[in-house]
């Protein structure tokens, strides 16, 4: 290849900024939004989307960003993947909706078959589909309660499971999610989650769980323990191996259903199709959503057949659950994972990002911790490493500086003092390097 072509390829940037951020058209639309959209739907990033392709997003002002927000983890296959667009178009031309329990359709059955082939269950398993991650969690608890005949549920500090009543009760962050919205669901109990950086060991957390079964709730009344294998909104905190094994053992000892919430961790985000595969531990039920359908509203509960069959006839469901257009997208997503090797790609992305983040940790005292699994990685900012006092203002300022430079970054953590990576797994090496360079420039601007 000619040297001038190689040089041009090397200097081509995915990011293209034409205006200040936000630009005039974005500001105008946001002003209209303020007049007609409910105030609680506040905006994290004040840029208005016009189109997306792969790992990039272009706003209405013509600015193109590299997208590390990824629809909050919904876009493992990227924006507008051609295979997904084709599948959605084809299904939409046939029919949009019937309600599967009224007039069933094959795509629901096919998606169940394909997901269960991938899911980490050794015996007979079944699936049920819903619209959003929060619905999947609520229905997983329904399955567990029906199977065990018990009412209580145990969750963990730092968890996020959704924003409807039961899932919000399980969620462990008051602001902005819970403050002023109670009362919450009864029979929900919470114990610490391991966090090595915050000096909560797996042994500590397991001891707290055992103590809760003595002091808070009798084990014979507990239907389920609901756990994220990597806490998402809590700050991308992976569960230690011995903790996951310990939870499984306690569930087995007391006949409790172990629910793995894989809404954010699933579909290759951690370098395995599902994060529970890292631990070699089989859950009883698993919730999935987000990247399952490339951003279309679809979620599911996958689990052991005996548990999934426990509720009575029509005890779970809903008018729109398992929409055929979203399920067609999901089948295309699974094809893309297989054809483009996105599980392995997530591992490569994770290794690349972790290497850069580790360098930042050495360079910037405010980068207190680097953690995650696969491509699901975050940095935690602190005021100083001695006290580890959370520094949420740094996470906010870095995200703002990055957006102005063309990188969309999200925050995370119960103190909102983390920046996290949820980039499309189809991101190219050049785009990844460019994005990490912008992140580093933003750190320099904020921390210098």
Q: Model-flagged regions — what are they?
A:
Residues 2-448:
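Conserved N-terminal phosphate-binding loop of PLP-dependent enzymes in the Aspartate aminotransferase
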């Amino acid at each position: 290849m000619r040297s001038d072509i190689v040089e041009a390829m090397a200097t081509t940037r995915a990011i293209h900024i034409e205006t200040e951020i936000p630009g005039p058209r974005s500001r105008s639309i946001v002003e209209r939004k303020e007049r007609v959209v409910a105030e609680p739907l506040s905006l994290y990033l004040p840029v208005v989307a016009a189109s997306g392709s792969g790992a990039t997003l272009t706003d209405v002002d013509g600015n193109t960003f590299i997208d590390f927000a990824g629809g909050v983890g919904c876009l493992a296959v990227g924006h507008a993947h051609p295979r997904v667009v084709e599948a959605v178009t084809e299904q939409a031309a046939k029919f949009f909706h019937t309600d599967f329990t009224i007039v069933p359709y094959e795509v629901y059955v096919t998606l169940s078959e394909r997901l269960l082939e991938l899911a980490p269950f050794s015996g007979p398993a079944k699936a049920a589909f819903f619209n959003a991650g929060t619905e999947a969690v609520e229905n997983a608890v329904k399955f567990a309660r029906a199977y065990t005949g018990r009412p209580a549920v145990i969750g963990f500090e730092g968890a996020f499971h959704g924003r409807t009543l039961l899932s919000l009760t399980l969620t462990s962050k008051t602001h902005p999610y819970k403050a002023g919205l109670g009362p919450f669901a009864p029979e929900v109990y919470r114990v610490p989650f391991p966090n090595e950086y915050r000096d909560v060991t797996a042994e500590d957390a397991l001891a707290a769980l055992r103590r809760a079964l003595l002091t808070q709730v009798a084990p014979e009344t507990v239907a389920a323990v609901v756990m994220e294998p990597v806490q998402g909104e809590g700050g991308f905190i992976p569960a230690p191996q011995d903790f996951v094994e310990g939870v499984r053992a306690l569930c087995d000892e007391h006949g409790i259903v172990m629910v793995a919430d894989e809404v954010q961790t699933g579909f290759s985000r951690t370098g395995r199709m599902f994060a529970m595969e890292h631990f070699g531990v089989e859950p009883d039920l698993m919730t999935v959503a987000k990247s399952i359908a490339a951003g279309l509203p679809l979620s599911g509960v996958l689990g052991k057949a005996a548990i999934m069959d426990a509720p009575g006839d029509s005890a779970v469901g809903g008018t729109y659950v398992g929409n055929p257009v979203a399920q067609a997208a999901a089948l295309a997503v699974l094809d893309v994972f297989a054809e483009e090797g996105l599980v392995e790609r997530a591992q490569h992305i994770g290794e690349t990002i972790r290497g850069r983040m580790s360098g930042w940790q050495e360079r910037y005292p405010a980068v207190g911790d680097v953690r995650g699994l696969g491509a699901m990685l975050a940095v935690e900012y602190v005021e100083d490493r001695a006290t580890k006092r959370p520094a949420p203002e740094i996470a906010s300022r870095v995200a703002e500086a990055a957006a102005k430079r063309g990188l969309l970054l999200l925050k995370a953590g119960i103190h909102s003092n983390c920046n996290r990576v949820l980039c499309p797994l189809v991101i190219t090496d050049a785009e990844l390097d460019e994005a990490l360079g912008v992140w580093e420039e933003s750190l320099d601007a904020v921390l210098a």
